[in-house]
Amino acid sequence: MVLSCFGFPAIEVTDDTYMSIFTRIIFFHATNIHKLLVVYKIMLIFVSDMGKINRTYKFRLYPNKAQADLLARHFGCARFVYNYFLNQRKEQYRLTGESDNYYAQAKTLTALKKQEATAWIKEVNSQTLQFAIRSLEIAYTNFFQKRAKFPNFKSKRSKNSFTVPQFVSIANNRLFIPKFKEGIKCCVHREIKGKIGKATISKTPSGKYFVSVFTEEEYATPLEKTNKSVGLDMGLKDLLITSEGETFKNNRYTRKYERKLARAQQHLSRKKKGSRGFENQRLKVARIHEKISNSRADYLHKCSISIVRRYDTICIEDLNVKGMKRNHHLAKSITDASWGSFVTMLTYKADWNGKTVVKINRYFPSSQTCNVCGYVNKRTKDLSVRDWECPVCHTHHNRDVNAAINILHFGLNSISAGTVDYTDGEEVRANLLKGRSSLKSEAHESLAHG
């Protein structure tokens, strides 16, 4: 067949030519359709997640005596199911090298309810028991992925809690969950704006009941952008020092209540276990611990939101808190400062408001490096050195402010270079030395010629 079009010379088109053209057209459209589908899926995910956050509301509960008894049964049954199936998994692995997963254990749970010896677990919400098995599955997953230690058995002294995965509602200052048709009196001090998902009911050592309601909601009013960046150095003398020289004091709540707590614990040790006096004194000790925990959390919330409000990019050190606690001289102070909790609060608040938290590598010698010329002063490894002067550029440094400035510079450079997260310490040291070599050589040359 011969084709001629728009004045071009006539060409002969064979069957092979038709097939070649047809194949190219199909391939072209298929490739572009695939690309469009990928882009469309990404846009759908982005639009669906845009402005949505998961938020937890915590409210105080005031159950009556009958409800408190039923809550106690829920706590006990959830703990029993968790321990029963943890023991089953351990025995199965010991005998066969394998163990049941969640789905197999859920079937076993159904059979367990039919047995006369364990029929009492039917008195509580079935979904609560299923969630206990799910929690065990998550604990195993975290262990295998090296995010946590191997799961332990729960004792009566462990945190009393259980989770209801669905059918949760709050109305007229009452919490409605399965098995509690009349609702539990609840102090709803904040409006719940999102869609309620699961709820976790807990009892503190001081005897107070709380519900943590998990929601998904739209975050309609993110904080305004400031176009400002900051570096944070976390310490023990002061909790935080910013690259602008601002300090957030370390309130040392454990030390503040140390004498009161020691006195209360001393009185507890003199009481007879099981007596009414022992229980009353135990509650006093628990309330002091609760006061310390609540005061610390309140202060950390205030510090974190203050920083997120004022800065768009926040650079911090990725500290190995667990490793630092091995220093028995500092372990108590590090625990009291609660750096890990602060970083968690800072991160999710920044995420909610479209701000960025950059974690720089722990191997970066932020306290030893001059932020002006890059000279590394090994003498400042000694924590008692709070101020020092650079022998190269003669800049006077406050140890903590200098560290915060270096953290800021390193974090911003990491963003621009696309190397925020490092995993290899040797690679970090090599990059640091390479990046500072030119600065150091220029500084030493100027010193020699000066």
Feature-to-residue mapping (PLM):
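Short acidic-glycine loop/turn motifs at beta-strand connectors
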Residues: A171, P205, S243-E246, C373, ...
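Acidic carboxylate diad motif detector
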Residues: Y103-T204
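Positively charged, low-complexity nucleic-acid-binding target-recognition regions
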Residues: I26-F28, N32-D49, N54, K332-S333, ...
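Gly/serine-rich nucleotide phosphate-binding loop at the start of the catalytic core
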Residues: M19-F22, F27-H29, H34-L129
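Short polybasic amphipathic segments
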Residues: V168, N173-K179, D238-T242, R386-E389
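Substrate-contacting helices/loops that form the catalytic groove of nucleic-acid
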Residues: L95-T118, I196, T204-V343, S416-G450
